[in-house]
UniProtKB/Swiss-Prot annotation:
Binds to the N-terminal domain of the chaperone ClpA. InterPro entries: ClpS (IPR022935), ClpS_core (IPR003769), Ribosomal_bL12_C/ClpS-like (IPR014719). Gene3D superfamilies: 3.30.1390.10. One of its GO terms (biological process) is protein catabolic process. It comes from Pseudomonas syringae pv. tomato (strain ATCC BAA-871 / DC3000). Belongs to the ClpS family. The lineage of its organism: Bacteria, Pseudomonadati, Pseudomonadota, Gammaproteobacteria, Pseudomonadales. This is ATP-dependent Clp protease adapter protein ClpS.
Length: 120
């Protein structure tokens, strides 16, 4: 069984009564809004003296979808420079990835630290 209803929408049928001009109640957009790309955030891994290199490579492969070669390069940068950028993402994705890495590291009993920083 289908129910149909007819709705008639009318606006100011009698013309302007208490308004001085005919455009009262009408919204007019002057210009198209400008769209901007969302701010990007770096996901950064920090070196520590206890997390095994194999574990860092695994994290980079699993959470950042890096191949073995690139994951190894990033891991070596973390090891030699103290930190390295794992990827550049919008804020919500960067926060999620950092939280996932930190949770996985804690569950695996490693002190690996992952944080986000605003790009630029």
């Amino acid at each position: 069984m289908h129910a149909f209803s007819k709705i008639r929408l009318t606006f100011n049928q009698d013309g302007p009564q208490s308004h001085e001009d005919d455009s009262a109640g009408i919204a007019v957009q002057d210009a198209k809004p400008t769209l901007q790309a969302p701010p990007m955030y770096k996901v950064v891994l920090f070196n520590d003296d206890y997390t095994p290199m194999d574990f860092v490579v695994e994290v980079l492969e699993v959470f950042f979808n890096l191949n073995r070669e690139l994951a190894t390069k990033v891991m070596l940068a973390v090891h030699t420079e103290g930190r390295a950028v794992c990827g550049l993402f919008t804020r919500d994705i960067a926060e999620t990835k950092a939280a996932q890495v930190n949770q996985y590291a804690r569950e695996s009993q490693h002190p690996l630290l992952c944080e986000i920083e605003k790009d630029g």
